[in-house]
Amino acid sequence: MELKVLNTGGTETGEVVTLNDEIFGADISEHAMYLDVKSILANRRQGTHKAKTRAEVRGGGRKPFRQKGTGNARQGSTRSPLMIGGGTIFGPQPRSYDQKVNKKVKQLARRSALSAKAQAGQIVVVEDFRLGEIKTKPVADILKNLGLAEKKTLMLTPEYDMIIARSGRNIEALNIMSAEKASTYDILDSQAIVFQKAALKKIEDTLG
């Protein structure tokens, strides 16, 4: 697949890049993408939830009232799960939600995600650019010129660029990162992917 390279003004530079078919034209494995995305989202969970059992709630655990003669159901402890202020049965406990996915499956998932975006025509290649200062307007103008101002966009740079990343931080629908850091979830969660030209080479080195 070939794509025309655009400048930051949104016009064609006359240059054409050829996308690597092993990465952007691969067979799409929905199952690999499912496993990787499920793992990414699960690994974000803190797992610090906690409910106290009857052994942990406050109180001495005395018998709340005598066994017979009150008309109430018998109770043996103020910490019983049946009492107000008592412990919780089978409540949530701290745990790790981490899910391991093999490296080959992760790479297959990323290739599948990029191939799906390429087939959908949601990949844009722009010439490499730099910003002189941290400022939102230049990045917003680039998105507008590319016709992506209203779309959830993933912008990939060859290396982490602090100035570009912080310039785009105030744009809610924009996510900026280096190409090698883009996960399957980042790719699938976007409506368009903007590659700086050098970022294509970077991702080919990572996934090739």
From Swiss-Prot:
Chain intervals with Polar residues compositional bias: 69-80
One GO BP annotation of this record: translation
Xref: InterPro entries: Ribosomal_uL4 (IPR002136), Ribosomal_uL4-like (IPR013005), Ribosomal_uL4_dom_sf (IPR023574)
Annotated region (Disordered), positions in chain: 46-84
CC per GO annotation: ribonucleoprotein complex; ribosome
Keyword set, alphabetical order: Ribonucleoprotein, Ribosomal protein, RNA-binding, rRNA-binding
SUPFAM superfamilies in alphabetical order: Ribosomal protein L4
Gene3D superfamilies: 3.40.1370.10
Top-level lineage group: Bacteria
GO molecular function, one term: rRNA binding
Assembly notes: Part of the 50S ribosomal subunit.
Cited function: One of the primary rRNA binding proteins, this protein initially binds near the 5'-end of the 23S rRNA. It is important during the early stages of 50S assembly. It makes multiple contacts with different domains of the 23S rRNA in the assembled 50S subunit and ribosome.
Family: Belongs to the universal ribosomal protein uL4 family.
Full protein name: Large ribosomal subunit protein uL4
Lineage: Bacteria, Pseudomonadati, Chlorobiota, Chlorobiia, Chlorobiales
